[in-house]
Design a protein with these regions (language model features):
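Long, mid-chain structured domain cores
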Residues: 83-87, 119-120
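Conserved AMP-binding A3 loop
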Residues: 51-79, 86
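Flexible, charged surface loops at secondary-structure boundaries
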Residues: 2, 47-48, 86-90, 127-133
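N-terminal leader/targeting and accessory segments in enzymes
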Residues: 1-37
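Short, well-ordered secondary-structure micro-motifs within conserved domains or adaptor modules
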Residues: 35-43, 130-137
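Short, contiguous clusters of charged residues that form electrostatic/catalytic patches at enzyme active sites
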Residues: 37, 41, 75-79, 106
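Conserved pre-ATP/AMP-binding loop-to-beta segment of ANL
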Residues: 38-55, 89-90
Length: 138
């Protein structure tokens, strides 16, 4: 269903075709650190032939549960965020949230959809280091 990858999209400095991104996702899922495994798992779900992804709610308003999100709605949200923040292709972005949760998943969707150059970092209290980014969700 979702084979579109913006030509300007980069993950940790590397460009990917659809097949290459699938391969990278599988590698991360099998061999990465925990935060990278979560990225790999989500990318595999994002790139599959289903029209939806399953997302675990946080439980902040009740019992945690799995919900279905349509990929088309996630793409529309990514585009709306890009418009609101005037994010242009090749803008730098940082994923420093777990891809186990919607905020981290949406950073990946935004990067793939808008052509952002996304760096990933293990979630911690000081993820930025010395690099400046155009867009970071924290």
């Amino acid at each position: 269903m979702n084979q579109f990858i913006h030509p300007d999209f980069k993950l940790n400095g590397k460009s990917f075709s659809y097949i290459e991104l699938l391969s990278e996702a599988l590698y991360l899922k099998e061999n990465g650190q925990l935060f990278e495994k979560n990225i790999g798992k989500f990318l595999l779900e994002w790139l599959n032939n289903e029209s939806f992804v399953l997302v675990q709610t946080s439980g902040s308003t009740g019992k945690p549960k799995k919900i279905v999100l349509q990929k088309s709605a996630m793409i529309a949200s990514a585009k709306a965020t890009g418009t609101f923040f005037n994010l242009q292709p090749k803008a730098s972005a940082l994923l420093c949230l777990s891809a186990d949760y919607i905020a981290g998943k949406m950073m990946l969707v935004r990067a793939i959809t808008l052509g952002l150059q996304l760096d990933t970092a293990e979630p911690n209290s000081n993820p930025l280091g010395n690099k400046k980014y155009d867009f970071v969700a924290m």
